[in-house]
């Protein structure tokens, strides 16, 4: 449905051109410092307003925390966040009614929800709804910080341009100072060029991102159906446009022999660890204290300005569609921030499931 | 934990060298024809006993249905299936105690469960435990058959050998008449050669499989967190050794432009459908009546006979490990059957979630 | 946590004196007629504004539907409803800070949430939060109406005054035309007298209500942990101040012999049914097509104006507390509406779980 | 369905006259001492074999732990327990086929499962299936012991005979040395007399039990839908034949005024606590460190030897039924043990949900 997680549970709602979108975040213990600024920071990261030609009318989100926070701390009760929709120009979408856009959710919604769904701006299927996920991710990241864990991602492929040079987690985090989070400046320049070209031609591009989670404690996850890998795959494929995922070295591992693929176990600082980390920090579904990383691949934005073949559902006959509304040349940058958020939410959920963070008492209580 | 699904729910248990493994299947309506033969057929498919050199001591599973079935039909109550473990030679594993095998779950289990876990034969992390999933999959496949849906998979890559020629879903199903389910005879021959070579050298290989689900009705899945893609990704990554997944055309979609990636919508038999199906039958997380397909990539079996570097956890110093027990040269064939099962379970769960199959009354009741 | 239900799922949020309370209702199929008026009607029923001396400053709730509804129908997506909190006078509560009110949740919240919780107006534990449940109940009642089922309750005891004369379900529904829903006019007069007396003396009273669900189809519920009785008990005890529940004839059944307690099975209109219905319409946890009914007992409002003994948590020494804010002389009337709502939500959830209402397609779609 | 709990999860299966009944217990951390003897002790308590005339052919259960336990400790993996059904004489039940027993689940099962369910011995609805719950309760009690909490219950009413004298929790525990756990010897004698009389007359009686949970830490439970009271109500009503529940002083509270009902808050050993405990240890759904207690009322066994009116479902005409099989004169003693188990399971689940017991590492690991 629209709820994700077991002990940290987020419930999202809202359509793109409706009154608002939002999220209820449940399971956060009392006493976590949390301000509107924490939420705003992540919502702003998602917007990439600084690339003006990419988002010509970019504006910061307007949101409110309706519950669960008092005096800069969580109360232990559900945190409801509403992100108000701006006055949108929906007339672009009038032509699309009953003419499902190829590659978009329109056809599926028509079959499942009939004439009742709000198709304007993509409605419930709009990438815009990931803003609610990103707001929840801001809270999850603060929970992770309690145990010294952090999540960050970057773009590794865009419009066919791939990042090829080696990098560290520090490089990943620093890449956010650039126009797009790309560790390799040459690749970044080429990517921006591809984006400009596609914007000019009314087309779109896909790409790939890599998410890292560092400092995640050992012992999270379970052998069969609570595997960290499986829960994060679920999380990642919940983000619109995701079409593939490689865990750790991913598909390359499938081409290796066992003697190559296995990461030797070594003593590190008096504790057992991996010499290499091709497996991405998880063995048998359980974290071992090594960094987690995985790559996620996204298809191009389905909305393009080129004419496309579709069906007029009222007449049930072929039709041509030309989209005239706003669209993102690539969903990759925004999806990256949503994927960071989903990763943080999933891992914070596991911290609570495993009891690493307790909830029978406040996180800190100077009164007691 | 060890339960998967919402309305069709499977709960698995058991360690590789313990008394038994098994599964409880909950949510099946009364009146579904089900016999031991249905279960046995799937358990046999998983074993590939016919490739003698691959499974030198291959024997069919011994199992019992303990509840939920009477006179060849389901009762509507939980179906418990126990698969008895055979007298296993665990002495191979004595040396491994406190010497975690690289690439295996040992190290993670040691960190999470301490000295309490049963490491013999891989314990709870053993690929053997997927037999319980396969038994549950047999039931799920019968539920899918009620609406005319079927699931089948095949091997598309093994030890670096790839299937390259085109094929149909009929080819996929017919490939099960061959020693391994590979649609391309040349590729099959090369794969068998690679397997033999690695068996001789005490090494292992990974590969990839493709799962198809055909006849799945429209309207299953939900826009945000009950996406069919996300639930199937969760399902697939629950199978041991899975490291990557491509939905539909997968990573290739990420390299296309929107105008190429979108599948045109056309009229098919008086209804809207896709001209091509690069997206794998799901739009916005919801089925549209087109076939679903995805590829899953598996790493090589971590157990190999070559010496490997590990740590002696008792002394916390480097150690060398040489595994002498039985192992599968590749997990790919067995995992394929488990992936078919997980796919069938996930989709049957969605049939129940959406109410396509009702549960307030028996499937058929000549009495009424 | 703050989510209830499996296929119809409500998630509530909000503190009494915070910005707003609200609810997200998930799982409703597309095409259910739903207007603000439907919600308002139930919110108004909960307020009993017509008894002026009971609610001196009674005002209708201000609420908004933020998502999931378009043109008077549900979209199939989550329905978020926000009920704005009015400018509340919180100064009454300043004295209560660190002086937990006996009988209220204050002490428990202090222990679990420390200084971080919002104690004003009872915060998250306030009876006010049941308005969100009542809003969700309005939607659930409309789902029940699809299959001809309806839920209604009445007061059977208040301040020690009991309803003793026999009545029908029609009487129960008609009792809502009176100041309080009580089928017996003499009892009603006595109850109003008791309420007035306690209001004057600054004390409060408890009581009991009975909930009926008529027209519920057969075959809902499951034998072990999805029992209708157990799910409704869970639902009922989720409403604040509930301290006891009698299912059907309840505790009286415990005093009978088997030969008296069993309801004879008879042919009714060509189908098997019960001659009497002491068991309250459920056998073995499953509905049989007979009316469901149960009684729920509520303790008196803990907030009273009489001085009470408590502890000053800052000094950890005895203290006396005198509450000066507004309080309800009895929670029974409002809780009754909340219990109707929880009953409707639980039963509508079971209609979806069992597939009686489908969700792979809209409820009605003239387009198709 | 047949799964109960969130972080401690039990899944039961089995029909009374099928091959076996059983339970899978999931979520127990590694390192909990657990032997067959722990399970057997609780299964034996449920049987009351020492009252020979009550259970003429009483025999201890035969069971096996199939997984999750090694060398006297839990492994952290699911614990599957199978309780084998004995060779039962099912011929008693032949006459009952298509003639539903009044008061039993037969009619409901016929409507929901049609001719497919196993009616022999009550099938899935048999009280016998609570043995699986009791086995799981044995494990939950050991988890509670980790934090110093314990659960025990006693009979407070049977066949109309009530316990009236005051007692302590020690009295409750000591009452288990008697033939039936009744704190008052006079009441016990009268109850045994009533049981004998009803056994002789082929009738049955109901009654009431009280469950105590002492030593439960503060801060468990949540304000809205994870209320301890609501979860325990759900737990209690999951036991067959339960028809009413009083939490704490229960219905008596509903007759008091607020000034009487509220328990004064006092300083106890330097901490805040309750002077009296009419509310049963829970405020606002959350534990406060005081003992929990509640009473549960059970209807008489529906199976009696007296002739009863029913319907022949094949002919759809009135019929008379005379049951000739074995039956329990009262379900109260066995249900008491099941209710203790459900209470322990629910509270242990909350210990895990709140993170009081962690699961990222073993409970104790001398190796580390």
Curated annotation (Swiss-Prot), chains A, B, C, D:
Gene3D superfamilies: Chorismate synthase AroC
GO aspect biological process, one term: aromatic amino acid family biosynthetic process
GO molecular function: chorismate synthase activity; FMN binding
CDD domains per the UniProt record, alphabetical: Chorismate_synthase
List of residues binding NADP(+): 46
Residues holding FMN: 124-126, 284, 299-303, 326
HAMAP family, per database record: Chorismate_synth
Its biological purpose: This reaction introduces a second double bond into the aromatic ring system.
PANTHER family linked to this entry: CHORISMATE SYNTHASE
Protein name per UniProt: Chorismate synthase
Gene that encodes the chain: aroC
């Amino acid at each position: 449905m629209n709820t994700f997680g077991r002990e940290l549970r987020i419930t999202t709602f809202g359509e793109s051109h409706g009154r608002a979108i939002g999220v209820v975040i449940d399971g956060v213990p009392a006493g976590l410092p949390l301000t509107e600024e924490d939420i705003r920071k992540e919502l702003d990261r998602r917007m990439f307003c600084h690339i003006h030609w990419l988002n010509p009318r970019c504006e910061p989100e307007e949101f409110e925390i309706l519950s669960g926070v008092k005096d800069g701390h969580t109360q232990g009760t559900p945190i409801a966040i509403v992100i108000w929709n701006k006055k949108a120009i929906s007339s672009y979408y009038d032509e699309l009614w009953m003419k499902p856009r190829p590659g978009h959710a329109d056809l599926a919604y028509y079959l499942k929800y009939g004439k009742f769904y709000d198709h304007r701006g993509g409605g419930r299927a709009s990438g815009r709804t990931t803003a609610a996920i990103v707001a929840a991710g801001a809270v999850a990241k603060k929970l992770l910080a309690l145990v010294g864990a952090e999540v960050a991602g970057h773009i590794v492929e865009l419009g066919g341009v791939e990042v090829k040079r080696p990098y560290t987690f520090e490089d990943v985090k620093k890449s956010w100072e650039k126009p797009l989070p790309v560790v390799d400046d040459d690749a970044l320049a080429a990517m921006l060029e591809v984006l400009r070209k596609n914007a000019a031609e009314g087309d779109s591009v896909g790409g790939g991102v890599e998410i890292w989670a560092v400092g995640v404690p050992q012992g999270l996850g379970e052998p069969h159906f609570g595997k960290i890998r499986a829960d994060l795959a679920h999380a990642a494929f919940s983000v619109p446009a995701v079409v593939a995922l490689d865990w750790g070295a991913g598909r390359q591992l499938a081409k290796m022999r066992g003697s190559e693929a296995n990461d030797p176990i070594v003593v590190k600082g008096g504790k057992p660890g991996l010499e290499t980390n091709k497996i991405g920090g998880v063995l048998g579904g359980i974290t071992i204290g090594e960094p987690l990383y995985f790559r996620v691949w996204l298809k191009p934005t389905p909305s393009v300005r080129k004419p496309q073949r579709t069906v007029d559902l009222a007449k049930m006959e072929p039709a041509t569609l030309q989209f005239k509304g706003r669209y993102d040349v690539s969903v990759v940058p925004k999806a990256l921030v949503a994927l960071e958020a989903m990763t943080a939410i999933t891992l914070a959920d596991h911290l609570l499931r495993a009891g690493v963070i307790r909830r029978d008492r406040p996180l800190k209580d100077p009164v007691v």
